[in-house]
A protein has these predicted regions:
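Structured adenosyl-cofactor binding patch, chiefly the S-adenosyl-L-methionine
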Residues: 113-157
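Loop/turn-to-beta-strand initiation segments
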Residues: 2, 99-104
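S-adenosyl-L-methionine/SAH cofactor-binding core of RNA-modifying enzymes
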Residues: 37-99
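General small-molecule cofactor/ligand-binding pocket signal
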Residues: 6, 34-36
Length: 157
């Protein structure tokens, strides 16, 4: 199994980067795993048209990196909510398609609709707001938890 995490921008907070490293190490027990940073568009003003342009550009960059046969999971505020066991079952089912999973997070402005159309799975972490870097950390933790659940290992500690 291959698992890739894609995120626009590069995290500067050491404590979060340390968390990424820890979960990449833990996940390497179960799969070949990687974290890839994508270009993040800088917006000079928060106008709707500027944000839309930036999201389209970020989406184009992301879609170039995702192969047609990869299963794309997106973290999206509009996505479906799952508990940990449901999410583990979903990952297990999707990984049986070809074993190549990609988890994509949007920038702080979200995701373009072209990404939503390409996604195989759209899920929400919570109704709470997180930075996209923290959302990636939480996603990695949940993927790790899912792997443990799917193998019948203790997962709640």
């Amino acid at each position: 199994m291959n698992i890739r995490f894609l995120i626009p921008g590069k995290c500067r907070e050491k404590y979060i980067k340390d968390g990424y490293d820890e979960y990449l190490k833990r996940l390497s027990r179960f799969a070949k795993v990687s974290l890839e940073y994508l270009p993040e568009e800088i917006i000079s003003n928060n106008s709707e048209s500027e944000i839309s342009k930036a999201l389209k550009k970020e989406a184009a960059n992301a879609l170039k990196r995702i192969k047609d046969d990869e299963v794309l999971f997106i973290v999206d505020i509009h996505g479906k909510s799952y508990d940990s066991k449901e999410f583990a079952s979903l990952i297990d089912d999707q990984s049986k398609k070809n074993g190549n999973l990609v988890f994509l997070l949007g920038s702080s402005y979200g995701l373009d609709d072209s990404i939503r159309k390409r996604a195989n799975v759209s899920f929400s972490l919570s109704k709470l707001t997180f930075t996209h870097y923290m959302a990636l950390f939480l996603t990695m933790e949940q993927v790790y938890r899912s792997m443990k659940i799917n193998r019948g290992e203790n997962y709640d500690k």
